[in-house]
From Swiss-Prot:
GO terms for MF: peptidase inhibitor activity
Region In vitro binds to LPS, mediates antimicrobial activity and inhibits LPS-mediated inflammation, residue ranges: 21-63
SS bond partners: 27-58, 34-52, 38-59
Membrane-spanning residues: none
Tissue expression remark: High-level and epididymis-specific expression. Detected in epithelial cells lining the efferent ductules, initial segment, and cauda regions of the epididymis, but not on spermatozoa.
Gene: DEFB126
Descriptive protein name: Beta-defensin 126
Keyword Transcription: no
Oligomeric and partner information: Homodimer or homooligomer; disulfide-linked.
UniProtKB keywords: Antibiotic, Antimicrobial, Cleavage on pair of basic residues, Defensin, Disulfide bond, Fertilization, Secreted, Signal
UniProt keyword Cell membrane, yes or no: no
Taxonomy, superkingdom: Eukaryota
Amino acid sequence: MKSLLFTLAVFMLLAQLVSGNLYVKRCLNDIGICKKTCKPEEVRSEHGWVMCGKRKACCVPADKRSAYPSFCVHSKTTKTSTVTARATATTATTATAATPLMISNGLISLMTTMAATPVSPTT
């Protein structure tokens, strides 16, 4: 009987020491998960630090993003993405100017009209 109680006490102590995902801290009304780093397919929320703390991020999985589009998620604008956006706008302007040439060659059915859209680095 004493060995049974001792075994039970050891298992109860070991159950508390086991590391793993027994409890996952949630954020943004149980939409996101608090993690140190987000996976590439997950979106990092700006307002998740309230629930997760300063050292963790609130990561929203891709399958839950479509169901809850109302929360605020900001993607970071980098210098590379701004340069790429400007290059795309320049290409679109060039393609729009080349449309009369496409009409004379009979390729108008393959060409769609593109308009240059300005990109601000703050959004």
